[in-house]
Amino acid sequence: MKKWKIAVRIAAFLGCAALLLYGLTVFLKDKRVTFDYDTTRKVEGFYAEEKDSLDFVFVGSSQMFTSVVPAVLWEEYGITSYDFGANEQPMYLSYYYIKEALKYQDPKAIVLEVSYCNAPEYTHEGVHHINLDDLRMGPVKLEAIFDIIPEGERFPYIFELAKYHDTWTTMDKASFQYIGADKHNPYKGYTPSLDGFADGGEFNEEIAKVTEKAELAELSVKYMEKIIALCKEKNVDLLFLKTPNDHIQNQPEYNAVADIAATHDIPYLDLNREMKGQLHNHVFHAETITKRIGEWLTSLYEVEDKRENPEFAQWHEDADYYYRYAHQLRLNGIEIFEEYMAELIGKDYIVCIAVNQDAGAYLSEEAVALMQQLGCQWDVSTAGGNSYLAVVENGIIHAETGSEDVVAYENRIYDHTFKVVSQGSQAGCNASIIIDGVEYAPNEKGFNIVVYDPKLDMILSTNSFEITES
């Protein structure tokens, strides 16, 4: 009986120690959770997707997950997809990502982005940690570690606390908040980029003329062949994709991929031959790229349009996150007051307006009408140099007032404290819009506007417009 009790105590002790070790690892492990470096959200978000719910899984490097926007595939075609990849991912790591993906999803096809089709050797430790750390510990991850990582360097990949034991000294607020957060990723692995041209720039026709074919590195070919064999074994289609990057010097490599695709009867879309691109494509150009990919996929497969399927209602919510983010970029690129107002009408944002010096004696009739559609009731064009402020939300007025004197508003909305102050030409010439103690107003002459999105819980836009006599 004594031996039994001792065994139970030892087992309980070991169990508690294991739980403590796991908890410390989760707490201290490096968390890559903010744009443009959000591999942790990307990988853990994949595991949060409902099993066998994805039509397509995209695998590859940052050139893939900054160019393929799952929200656009959903919005345009009703296709469910996910960008399951990590920074600088070579073929030998893509192989293990595909192997891991097929444990959880049974897609119509794996879409392999081939930018890193010519890695001549195993890359450096940093890339290995970025790609391996966030995969779930299990047979696939262990196989990858023992296959890729040299003997003598594997310990911190298996027992991650050995590498990250002192990261508590450098953890930021986002990392702390992520520990207990829902791991669902509404962006479906996509990472927005603001690099390069919003329209992609001018297409380099010289790329389409390149016919040379490189001899790909043996290591890359080996793992591409393993990927092909794996997909055949799992009875899932494999597609090759090259997102546009305008790297004419690498086009012979992408041409060589075409030979591999032809040998194995694998559909291959090389967008370098169709459109301009960058290393990381701008959000708006990524939309164009994704629409082209959607055309390609729907030409190859009959895919159920799930937009009206109530079982996929969450996909509408998730896509909305992306389109709100994209709307932020569009707002911040607008320089005309009327266009800016028009973009805000009908949106469930909180719009804070504070006038500095001049309340809009030269406002056009169109501008006044747009402000009234937004929810403002005053005809601000008659206010001259008076102070004026407004706080409106999708047609609902939280506050609107004007005077020759200083006007101010303070209240809590959505658990945030909003404080708005306007001082017209007779009251000191100042504009202030403070949210949770942080000043966001540009405090320029004219209309100072701050837009808060309660769904994204973020400041969407800050802008100012001086209305002058035309």
Language model features with spans:
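C-terminal regions of proteins
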Residues: 252-323
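Secreted/periplasmic serine-hydrolase-like ester/acetyl group-modifying domain
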Residues: 127-234, 306-327
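Hydrophobic membrane-insertion alpha-helices, especially the h-region
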Residues: 5-26
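Short acidic-hydrophobic catalytic motif
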Residues: 327-470
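Acidic-and-aromatic substrate-binding clefts and catalytic sites of carbohydrate-active enzymes
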Residues: 88-92, 216-218, 245-252, 360
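Alpha-helical transmembrane signal-anchor/signal-peptide segments
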Residues: 28-49
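Short hydrophobic beta-strand that contains or immediately precedes a catalytic carboxylate
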Residues: 56-60, 281
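Membrane-embedded segments
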Residues: 59, 63-145
